[in-house]
Amino acid sequence: MNTTALLIGLGPLLGWGLYPTIASKIGGRPVNQILGSTIGTLIFALIYAWVQGIAFPSGMNLWFSILSGIGWASAQIVTFKVFTMVGSSRAMPITTAFQLLGASLWGVFALGDWPGAMDKVLGGLALVGIIIGAWLTVWSEHKDAGNARTLRQAVIWLAVGEIGYWAYSAAPQATNIGGEEAFVPQAIGMVIVSIVYALFLASRGEKLALVEGVSYTHIISGFFFAFAALTYLISAQPNMNGLATGFILSQTSVVLATLTGIWFLGQKKTTKEMWVTIGGLILIIAAAAVTVTI
């Protein structure tokens, strides 16, 4: 692995690692966050496609790419909602764990990954490790019935949201185009969801997010997400880091997302909780490394 490949591979660490913290810091409602983020992603994708001269896909390639973006935006709305319940430092390790579980199980049952018996044993142990790691990140030294109930609700919401993240990853596999070509249609799907969501909430009496300034401030956070998505696509190419190594490098973003949430958003933990959280993060990343190297 050369220095250029490594730096590109760490792009998602910065982009996806800082994205939830920046979005939470800017504030606003989940609808403001998703609207600005998706507009920022679309602007970034359009500029990149124009600079690189990337053709716009058509037919089923176009529709599956848009579906992919719809899946991500739908899931991200759920994730933003959970941020308001338990904070990004708790939500991010859980949603990362669900995404790893979903991607691994989809690979096994739909794509034929882990074909041997030993592969399945190692993979199963890795999935257990991911679950334990996620649990460690939300462990609380001082038990509180109200907090425990809220956390259970958050976990259920994130489990439902995983359906959207799964669609984001799985839909492009039904196309015969590369990730860079799918980037703009994905962003279009994301914006469609955010606008529909904003109009739906407005019809129920909430202020229309399209006329709120904070929505457009969130374009900044959208640039961070788009930067991460693009550098991951480049990193995963065979002449860079390859899919397996690129994926592992991208998952390090959960560490930055969790720690910046604690340090900059006031999502406090005791010393013991902090050490347990770090242990959980290490376990999640180690288990992710196992799943892609089997």
Swiss-Prot record:
Listed InterPro entries: Sugar_transport
Localization annotation: Cell membrane
Gene transcribed to yield this protein: rbsU
Family: Belongs to the GRP transporter (TC 2.A.7.5) family.
Residue ranges that the Swiss-Prot or TrEMBL entry lists as coiled coil: none
Membrane-protein topology: Multi-pass membrane protein
CDD domains with a match to the protein in the record: ribose_uptake_RbsU
Record SUPFAM superfamilies: Multidrug resistance efflux transporter EmrE
The protein's name in its UniProt record: Putative ribose uptake protein RbsU
NCBIfam families assigned to the protein according to its UniProt record, in alphabetical order: symport_RbsU
Recorded GO MF terms: carbohydrate transmembrane transporter activity
Gene Ontology terms: cellular component: plasma membrane
Transmembrane segments: 5-24, 34-56, 61-80, 90-112, 121-138, 153-170, 182-204, 214-236, 243-265, 275-292
Record key words, sorted: Cell membrane, Membrane, Sugar transport, Transmembrane, Transmembrane helix, Transport
Organism of origin: Lactiplantibacillus plantarum (strain ATCC BAA-793 / NCIMB 8826 / WCFS1) (Lactobacillus plantarum)
Biological function: Could be involved in the uptake of ribose.
Domain of life: Bacteria
PANTHER family: TRANSMEMBRANE PROTEIN 144 (PTHR16119:SF17)
